[in-house]
Structure formats: structure tokens, C-alpha cells
Amino acid sequence: MNQYPLVYLDHVHKNYGDAPALYDVSLNIQPGRIIGLLGPNGSGKTTIIKLINGLLQPTSGHIYLKGVKPSPDTKRIVSYLPDTTYLSDSSKVIEAVKYFQDFYDNFDSTKAMQLLKDLHIDPQVRIGSLSKGNKEKMQLILVMSRHAELYILDEPIGGVDPAARDYILQTIIQNRTPQSSVIISTHLIADIEPILDEVILINQGQILLHENANQLRQQYNQSIDNLFRNQFRFY
């Protein structure tokens, strides 16, 4: 058994030039958890996500995935859904599936095709012809069809209708293994709150708290959504 945390940030600082983005961030994320990474715009959420993915390097401090620093060898551990569309509208859905199949050795194309079928998405249509909701669902399907140990989802339900949000949350729950963890960054806290095991609150590049979601609700006698609104009502 691997004795290391799934994700470990050790006193991480990140500057963009002279501007600090993260200040002395330490995090310990264990397997089998769904974690909400919550904070106002510009708080440092996306910087943390990119550091874990190895897309940025810390100014100081250390980041480990199962005891190893982010590298090409750790790419199979993490499946990442960015907050912007990364697939060409001119490509067909089936081409996106084949791209993931060729690029990731832990991608389950059978699962992806079945999920697309469940949505009645024709794999031969071009991505640009899909509705916004179906496009976001398709991207999530691709990410969740990898047998990864950590799924990082940046605003996975932003800009879609409530019915689409429900589908996306169910897809997240049903397509992870009990030992895989999910980090969700979103502003739509009320929608994701029911599935969260843990909450990380961040502001101005600093971690304010990292706690069990149920314990937070009991401690403050309010929902995570209300706690967030009260904490950041002036931001």
C-alpha cells in the first residue's frame, strides 16, 4: 500500500512576477474523497489546480502526487477538466474519443461511448453543433472515462441549466472508484454541496480552512453555501 497522501502541498508559494498568487499553502488530500475548492475570483483556486497538474511550478515549497513531484510520469494519476473548452468545434465527437484513447493509456473508450449513447449524442456530429450543455457533458464524459486516481474539475457545472448540472453531478459520482478523489472548483456551491466530503476555503492565496463538510455544517449550524456567502460577502 502506498503510504503517501494522494496529493500533498508543503508550504507552497507561487508568484507571478512580483505579484503573489499563493502564500504558504499546505494541503493533504487522501484517496476516496470529494473535495470542494471554494473561493472568490482571483483567490488562487486555478493556480492550485495548475500546480497539481504540473502546468505551473511553485516559486517555493513542494508538491507531491503519491510521494512523487508532478512530472510526465504522474500524468496518468490526474484527469483534468479545465474551465475553458479545449476541443476544436470542427472535430467530430468520435475524433475526440479517439484522441483521448490514443493519448491516455487509462482511457476507457467503451465507457465513453456508452455514456455518449445514454445522452443520445451522435459520435459522428461535429462538436460545434452540440448545445452548450451537451458540449460540457461530453467533455466531462471524456475526463471521467479515464481510470485516474484524482479528477480535477474546474467549473464543471458553470453555464449549464439545472437539469444538466444534475446529470454532471451524477456522472461524477457514478464514474469514480471508491479510492479515487475528486477536486471540484466552482461558484455554484449549493449544487455541489450534497456530494462534498471536504471543503477547502481559499482567499487571497491563503487557505482559510480545510475541513470535513459535515463537521463544518454542524459547527456553524448552516450550509456550506451560506458559510461561503457570509465569509466572502464583501468580495
Predicted regions and their residues:
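Conserved ABC transporter NBD signature motif
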Residues: 60-74
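ABC ATPase "signature
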Residues: 210-211
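Helix-to-loop junction immediately C-terminal to a conserved catalytic motif
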Residues: 53
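ABC-family P-loop ATPase nucleotide-binding domains
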Residues: 83-139
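The feature captures the beta-strand-to-loop junction immediately N-terminal to the Walker
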Residues: 38-40
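Catalytic Walker B motif of ABC-type/P-loop ATPase nucleotide-binding domains
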Residues: 151-155
